[in-house]
Amino acid sequence: MTRLLVVSHTVSPPLAELVDIVVVSAKNAAAEIGVDLDLRTRPALTGSALDVLEADGIIFGTPVNIGYMSGALKHFFDQIYYPCMNETTSLPYGYFLHGNNDAAGAVAAIDTIVGALKWRRVGAPLQVTAGITPTGRQELTDLTSRVVAAAAGL
């Protein structure tokens, strides 16, 4: 059984739609590669170190507020950092962001945190500004598929 954890702070309809795309894409990817998937979704404010410790892969999503990740996702990282620091090395992950402007600060902050955790990024972060395009939908589907495959050890 492959466990995929999806952690997000979904304060807007577009972000909720992105999470829905991840959930459907993860199930489809698992079926396509013949993997039994235990998919767990958690709000960033309630996700825990135990959730991460039990996961084989993780995808997280955040709004970009004033050029930075949401406080909720930062809170999640603060809660899991020390318990997971030496226990989750090489955990495959991917992430997506939604905002109406530049996400460079959010990307830099997230990359710094997951770099310190020594997790393994399996695809470039997806940055969605304004609406979700068919291209953005496909890129998120592809990212999710890569995380599922990596979580399954493929």
What are these regions (language model features)?
Residues 2-30:
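N-terminal beta1-alpha1 ligand-phosphate binding loop
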